[in-house]
């Protein structure tokens, strides 16, 4: 079974491609996490977990969900992580997670996809994003070939910098940067509730037709990047930046 969590669609796209290539069922963790559903999941022997990279590891919300949820029938697990640039030493923590689940760790693969973390970085314009997705195809094909053969992924790079970013920096990043305080709606907001619908942690509610953010945020960027009116800002960090979600790339270029 292919499990995935996504913020703005990159991981969903990769997970769908992998599930199609392996003829495996696809399981949406966003829906489970949003519903607080930790009932056992009948996965079968092989599990492929596809996630974005948050602070140089898999998202904390995903590792927490896995810690509470039995993967019935699972014996082996592969991790596929998409990122804007690098995953650090995420593989070391994925190995630990597999051991905690008493699963055979089959490796971690990195696939570069368009950046979406506009709370800190710049997202690409649409044409550049399309180019990045095209450039990701060889890596995706390698991952598919290795999965079809039941092979372990080759170990990713691991140096002192990687260990530092995934190690000490990760909890500091969550503590000081992963907050919803800076999100706000502009006058362009039409109160459609798209942000409320997409938030995997139920951290957004509408008050007087405008979104209000709570304290439980994972910085997935779904609210700000999917807003149809681009009416959400993250303090001054997001002003003037392109909003990125994968589905926009699938629309006609003149749309």
Residue ranges of each PLM-predicted region?
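Short low-complexity, flexible loop/linker segments enriched in glycine and/or proline
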Residues: 41-42, 121-123, 220-222, 248-252
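Iron-sulfur cluster-binding cysteine motifs and their immediate structural context
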Residues: 184-185, 190-212, 216-218, 222-239
């Amino acid at each position: 079974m292919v499990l995935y969590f996504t913020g703005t669609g990159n991981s969903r796209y990769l997970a769908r491609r992998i599930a199609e290539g392996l003829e495996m069922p696809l399981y949406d963790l966003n829906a489970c996490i949003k519903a607080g559903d930790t009932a056992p999941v009948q996965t079968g022997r092989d599990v492929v977990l596809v996630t974005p990279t948050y602070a140089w590891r898999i998202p904390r919300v995903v590792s927490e969900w896995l810690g509470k949820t039995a993967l019935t029938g699972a014996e082996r697990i592969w991790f596929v992580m998409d990122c804007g640039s690098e995953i650090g030493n995420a593989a070391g923590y994925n190995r630990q997670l597999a051991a905690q689940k008493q699963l055979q760790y089959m490796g971690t693969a990195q696939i570069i996809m368009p950046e979406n973390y506009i709370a800190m970085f710049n997202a690409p314009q649409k044409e550049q994003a399309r180019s990045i997705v095209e450039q990701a195809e060889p890596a995706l094909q390698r991952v598919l070939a290795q999965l079809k053969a039941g092979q372990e992924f080759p170990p990713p790079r691991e140096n002192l910098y990687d260990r530092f970013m995934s190690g000490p920096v990760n909890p500091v990043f969550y503590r000081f940067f992963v907050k919803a305080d800076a999100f706000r709606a502009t006058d362009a907001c039409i109160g459609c509730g798209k942000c409320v619908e997409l938030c995997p942690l139920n951290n957004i509610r509408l008050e007087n037709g405008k979104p209000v953010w709570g304290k439980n945020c994972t910085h997935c960027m779904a609210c700000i990047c999917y807003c149809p009116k681009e009416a959400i800002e993250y303090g001054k960090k997001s002003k003037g930046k392109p909003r990125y979600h994968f589905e926009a790339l699938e629309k006609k270029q003149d749309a």
